[in-house]
Amino acid sequence: MRKIRLISIITILVLVLATIPVFAGCGKVAAYADPATENILIAMNDGDYASFSKDFDDTMKSELSEDAFPDFVASVNGQVGDYIADSKDFKGFNTSNGITTTEYMIDFEAMEDVALEVIFQKIDGKMMVVGLWFN
């Protein structure tokens, strides 16, 4: 009986210790992803391309250029309204081959719980946005 209890305690302790790095990683990712993501969404509301693209890498800036920005914003906000500031809920992330995919649920004026993925990559020592998808 005592042996079974000791094994149970050890098992629980191992599981708790194994989750610590996961939660620590979550905090590190959210520390750069949350402000960058909020900035992108608020800049869309404001029609401010300079703010919208400030964390984009060069490829992302060329693919979603200042000329294309108004049409992009219209395609999103035209369907769901403006983003509701600070409504994003960080759901998690996945890192593979130096690319970190963050997942959020966000609210707009006309629709709640819209899925958003923001993709980051470290470039020249800074985490840059290399992808952005609304689902």
Named regions from a protein language model:
Residues 1, 25-29, 135:
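Absolute protein N-terminus
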Residues 3-26:
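Sec-dependent N-terminal signal peptides of Gram-positive bacterial secreted proteins and lipoproteins
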Residues 19, 24-46:
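Short, low-complexity N-terminal intrinsically disordered segments enriched in polar/charged residues
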Residues 28, 40-41, 60, 64, ...:
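A general boundary/transition motif marking the beginning of the first structured unit of a protein
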Residues 34-37, 53, 113:
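Residue-level signal for cytosolic alpha-helical hairpin/rod architecture
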Residues 87-135:
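Exposed beta-sheet edge and beta->alpha loop/turn motif
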